[in-house]
UniProtKB/Swiss-Prot annotation:
Its main location: membrane. It is found in: Cell membrane. The keyword Ribosomal protein does not apply. Keywords: Cell membrane, Ion transport, Manganese, Membrane, Transmembrane, Transmembrane helix, Transport. The lineage of its organism: Bacteria, Bacillati, Bacillota, Clostridia, Eubacteriales. The chain crosses the membrane at residues 3-23, 39-59, 65-85, 116-136, 141-161, 176-196. Probably functions as a manganese efflux pump. This is Putative manganese efflux pump MntP. The keyword Ion transport applies.
Amino acid sequence: MDLVSIILISIGLSMDAFAVSITNGAMISKVTASEGIRIGLFFGGFQALMPLIGWSIGIKFESYIAALDHWIALILLSIIGGKMIYDSIKENRDNKDEIACDYAVGEKKCLNNKTLTLLAIATSIDALAIGVSFAFLKVSIINTIIIIGSITFVICFIGVMIGKKCGKLLKKRAEILGGIVLIFIGIKIFIEHTNILSKIF
């Protein structure tokens, strides 16, 4: 897998965390740079950890399903991407937003570490599934999780900072964009591994 694909996957995966970061930034009473860094570190850390766990699981079964690697990548990325798009257009907010709201408003003026951990886990489950597909692709897992974690950190920091001004609108668009990116990468991997275009043309 090339660097551009890894970066695009990182951006796509980070959109869920970005959306929650915007929600937090829009609702906590005082948004500061240090708060943005703290939130970014939590989300970025878990977003890097989950693919590593998924990769570790997938590598154990590589010999059994290596012939299906492109199908696994396509299916996982498409399901996750489709779910992100579906969730973003639902009328009701999902559980991640409800957790964020519960702790970000009222008497709670900022997010505590326990809440951030729950949010970070909730938004990185998709990355766990993607990590499984990494086991069947030619990627350097260490470099990949560093890129994923770093990009998520930066994007979440930005999300917190701008959440006050355009939280609701940008949150919805971010999830849709993230879903589209993941589906696109899934199709790209499938085409590359099957050489389907060369067979057609």
